[in-house]
Each structure stands twice: as structure tokens, then as C-alpha cells.
């Protein structure tokens, strides 16, 4: 796992020979982190990488004493249901109504 600090947040990424994932974390207040550009390449799906990304996000949130994770995803995509399965709730439609803001409150 490599970690890179950027001007706007932190980037975590992992490279395998044929695929990779990246997770961008932004924290602009003391109680919420925002995930952006969470990606697992198509051929890597079904191998638990998405679960690992969410574990990393939750670990990083807890490390910062943050209790809420928010993200935005395409509402018509399978990934919307996948996030719900992993404890995220619909929060509100984005200005562009194709996207839904979602949140997960950590224990």
C-alpha cells in the first residue's frame, strides 16, 4: 500500500501486476471524510478489493476520530446498491440528479 499526501487530501493506492485501486480521502471538517474516485478495475472485481478499500477508509476515519464517511455515486449503477449493502444510506440527490450523496455513520 502506498500513501501520498496531496494538497486536497490523501491518496491511497495499491498496484498489482494487472490491476490497481485508488482511494482519495478529503476531510474539510472534524466529523466527516469524503471519498472520491474509488475505483477497482473491471477484471479485478469480485476479489474483495472494494471491501478492502472501505476497510481502509473506515480505518483512516477512525484514526482521525471522524464518525461519518460520505461519497457520491451514480444512482443508476450497481455500485449504489453495493454501497447500501456495506452500510451506506442515501443522503440526498446531487444537483445533477444522476448522482446520490450517501453516508455511513461509524460505530
Task: List the model feature ranges, each with a label.
Residues 40, 46-59, 85:
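Conserved acetyl-CoA-binding loop-helix of GNAT-fold acetyltransferases
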Residues 61-74:
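Conserved GNAT acetyl-CoA-binding A-motif
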Residues 36, 72, 103:
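Residue-level detector of conserved, well-ordered beta-strand and adjacent loop positions
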Residues 93-107:
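Active-site/acyl-donor-binding loops of N-acyltransferases
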Residues 28, 43, 76-78:
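Short coil/turn motifs at secondary-structure junctions
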Residues 1-36, 41, 93-97:
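Acetyl-CoA-dependent GNAT
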Residues 71-80, 95-99:
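Conserved beta-strand-loop-alpha-helix junction that forms the acyl-donor binding cleft
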Residues 84-93:
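Conserved acetyl-CoA-binding loop of GNAT-fold acetyltransferases
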Amino acid at each position: 500500500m502506498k500513501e501520498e499526501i496531496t494538497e486536497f487530501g490523501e491518496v491511497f493506492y495499491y498496484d498489482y501486476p494487472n490491476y490497481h485501486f485508488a482511494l482519495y480521502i478529503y476531510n474539510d471538517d472534524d466529523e466527516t471524510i469524503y471519498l472520491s474516485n474509488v475505483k477497482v478495475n473491471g477484471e479485478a472485481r469480485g476479489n474483495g478489493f472494494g471491501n478492502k478499500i472501505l476497510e481502509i477508509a473506515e480505518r483512516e476515519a477512525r484514526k482521525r476520530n471522524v464518525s461519518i464517511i460520505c461519497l457520491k455515486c451514480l444512482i443508476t449503477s450497481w455500485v449504489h446498491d453495493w454501497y447500501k449493502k456495506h452500510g451506506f444510506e442515501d443522503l440526498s440527490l446531487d444537483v445533477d440528479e444522476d448522482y446520490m450523496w450517501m453516508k455511513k455513520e461509524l460505530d
